[in-house]
Amino acid sequence: MNKIDFVVTWVDGGDPIWQAKKAKYSGAVDTSKNSMNSVKAYRDWGTFKYWFRGVEKFAPWVNKVYLVTDQQKPSWLDINSEKLVLVDHTEIICNDYLPVFSANPIESNIHRIPGLSEHFVFFNDDMYLTAPVEPTDFFSEDGLPKYNTALSPIIPERYGTGNFQVNDMEIVTSYFSRNEILKNGQFFDPKQGLKSIVKSLLYRNSQFICGFWESHLPYPLLRSTMNLVWEKEKAVLERTSASRFRNPSDTNVWLFKYWQIASGKYAIGNPKLGGLFSLDNAGPDFWKILNSGKYQIMCINDGFNIQDEEQVMTDFIKAMDQLLPDRSSFEI
């Protein structure tokens, strides 16, 4: 197995300098509670250090950890940590497009990180390692990224990711026919798991490929694939890169994952590797799950309808500290 790097993006939405910069450009952008550019999209729960603790405890084999930020760093971060590389937006995004306040342009350019390995795993900062993982959880022995997927319709939810997924799939289906995708996608392989196979069976006779199911877990990616898609769809990806705030015309990082699936250049992952959770549902039972070791990876999404945010934040930090009490080498 070749070297595997981790890439994670982070923003401190409470930073006054960053807030002033954002306010300068936000203008007519919808930043209401449920919008795609709401405060929730930038909120920091104070749990990011546990992301690093999880990496050190549960994935000590990782080569480098690239932290991508906009001229920011957590106050507790040891920038001299051996495995850490800080990456500023100016290193990967054209200066003409900066500053950006959307994940889409940032994530679409992570392959430009200087020194990044061919094999890397991209994390959002709400995707935590909660039990040991191995390189083979993310890549096959011959270096293919591992995914668990299914045919699944794109959900047209207001303020959701449906627009981005449609744009991603529009590109993918312009290069791969329906029959090629059905052949290459391995949707009916038993290793996908019963739930995924049932989903795919429901939609296999559709005239068109309706979309791929998204697990919301870290994304194993190949730098060469991102370069290839950029070569083929530079104009589209440049438009996304120039999108200062989330825009319905954007593509997102799933495009590169979908390309791997449609081309058949992927291996099937463990369908029980992790799960998606929301802080809307946080309570005693959830905190027990967090510390149970049942899931190796947990994506813990911020919520739109958290009843008592202060209490949830306190409980969240307490539960993470119970799971990962020891300071990591990434901390001062």
UniProtKB/Swiss-Prot annotation:
Record-level GO BP terms: polysaccharide biosynthetic process
Keyword Transferase: yes
A Pfam family annotated for this UniProt entry: Stealth_CR2
Top-level lineage group: Bacteria
GO molecular function: transferase activity, transferring phosphorus-containing groups
Entry keyword set: Exopolysaccharide synthesis, Transferase
EC number(s) from the headed UniProt entry: 2.7.-.-
Top enzyme class: transferase
Family classification: Belongs to the stealth family.
Miscellaneous section: Stealth proteins are part of a protein family that is conserved from bacteria to higher eukaryotes. Family members were first identified in microbes as proteins that help pathogens to elude the host innate immune system. Microbial stealth proteins are involved in the biosynthesis of exopolysaccharides. Stealth proteins are predicted to function as hexose-1-phosphoryltransferases.
Name this protein carries in UniProt: Receptor polysaccharide phosphotransferase WefC
Organism from which the protein derives: Streptococcus oralis
Gene name per UniProt: wefC
